[in-house]
Amino acid sequence: MLQTGIVYRVADLVIEAGALILAELRRPGGPRGSGYKAEVDLEIEVVLRRGLEQILSCDFVGEETGRHQTGHRYCWVVDPNDGTADFLAGRSGSAVSVGLLDEGEPVLGVVYAPGTPRGSDCIAWQQGMNALFRNGRVIAPSKQNRDLKGSVVFVSSAAASKRAENDILCAPATCEPIPSIAYRLARVAAGDGAAGVSLYPVSPHDIVAGHALLKAVGGDIFDQDGKPIRYTVSAEFIYPVEQCFGGQVEACRTLLTRQWLTLLKLEPGA
């Protein structure tokens, strides 16, 4: 069993590392980097890796610093700055994502978005907890957002230029663009919406933390074929994931019936 309370130490570490995102956004001339790589991403992951090894020394898979795998039952899975392309364009809403797998099962997740229009937001959970905690407070996710009707579906920032088309696909919910898939999933787990969607391939480091949070509230993540997404003991997907739909099961099942491929001809990224 995972040691009680380590999620609080992880959250403190993630918030500390997330301060680098804000500092980078405020640099004269904007963030350093191009395309899908920001220089600060590596700096953040180095801080996270060092701190996580002190909290629980085990295997590690990071987007920037690579893999350290020995066959340990636990494995940290880290994305230091999910939503880098939007971050480099000066848009807020990227997130630090730290998940922990126990023999391929998500058992801890911390997602921290330091610079959203709503302010900083940290959502976390670990196995054995009865509820999520958000910004230091225990929360009971709202049941009213578990269905699509009257709720929102979190989609990529590319949807901002095609709101009407996305709203049709999300109906009877409406769409809300967010750069980070990790943060989309975390907000769904916290009760802010019914589902989070990515129409482009994701990696385990993008979604393990959010998957843990969804698991805590009875949700799940499905691939483009409607199969529940699962991981190997080496922190890889069992099947290739081209798209993902995360949230309450019935909401995801409904969204999976929609013609999302039509958007790929309209949007540069999702």
Question: Residue locations for each model-derived region?
Answer:
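Generic detector of well-ordered alpha-helical packing
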Residues: L42, E64, P80-G83, F87, ...
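Oxyanion/phosphate-interacting regions
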Residues: M1-D12, G18, D167-L169, A186-A270
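N-terminal subdomain of lithium-sensitive/metallo-dependent phosphomonoesterases centered on the IMPase/IPPase/PAP
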Residues: M1-N81, K265-A270
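Residue-level signal for inorganic ion chemistry
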Residues: A17, I21, L52, T84, ...
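Short glycine-aspartate micro-motif
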Residues: C75-V77, D86, G109, G196
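Substrate-binding/gating loop at the entrance of the active-site cleft, primarily
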Residues: G83-V98, G104, G115
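Acidic beta-strand-loop-alpha-helix segment within the catalytic core
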Residues: G99-A186, D192, F237-A270
